[in-house]
C-alpha cells in the first residue's frame, strides 16, 4: 500500500501539547491512535509525536507535514500527544508519568532548536477542551504538574 503524502508545513509558529484522553492503565501508542484517527475518517494519525507511558517517543506524521490536531492551526504547528489524561470516570487528570514529562521536555527542547520562534501551547489554549488535562504553562515555568480542566 502506498504511503499517504501530506502537504509540507511552510511555517511553524506553535507546538501544541495534547493528551490521548485515555486512563492511566492504558498504554497505547502511535499504532492505536492512528487506528482511532482513521476510524474518524482521517487519512493517518494527526499528531507528529506520541509519548507513551514509559516515556518512549513515537513518530506520527512526518515532522514537516501539516498535522491534524488543532482546528485552525494545523498548517503552522507541530502536535505532541501524551498518552493518558483522564481518570477512571473520564474526568481530566494529570496522570502522566515522570518519564513522559521528561520525554516531553526533551521533545520540546529539540523542537525549539529547529523552530526557535515557535511558542509552546496547550490544546485548551485555543479550543474549549480540557486537553492536555494539565496547566502546561505552569509546568513549563515551574516543572509542577497540576490537573487543569480548562475549556
Curated annotation (Swiss-Prot):
Presence of keyword Membrane: no
* Biological processes, Gene Ontology terms: defense response to bacterium; negative regulation of viral transcription; peptidoglycan catabolic process; viral release from host cell by cytolysis
Q: Which UniProt keywords apply?
A: Antimicrobial, Bacteriolytic enzyme, Cytolysis, Host cell lysis by virus, Host cytoplasm, Hydrolase, Late protein, Metal-binding, Viral release from host cell, Zinc
Instruction: Tell me what controls its activity.
Output: Binding to the viral RNA polymerase inhibits amidase activity.
Please tell me where Zn(2+) binds in this chain: 18, 123, 131
Catalysed reaction equations from the record:
Hydrolyzes the link between N-acetylmuramoyl residues and L-amino acid residues in certain cell-wall glycopeptides
Location in the cell reads: Host cytoplasm
Main location class: host cell
Q: Specify the protein name.
A: Endolysin
- Which species expresses this protein natively? Enterobacteria phage K11 (Bacteriophage K11)
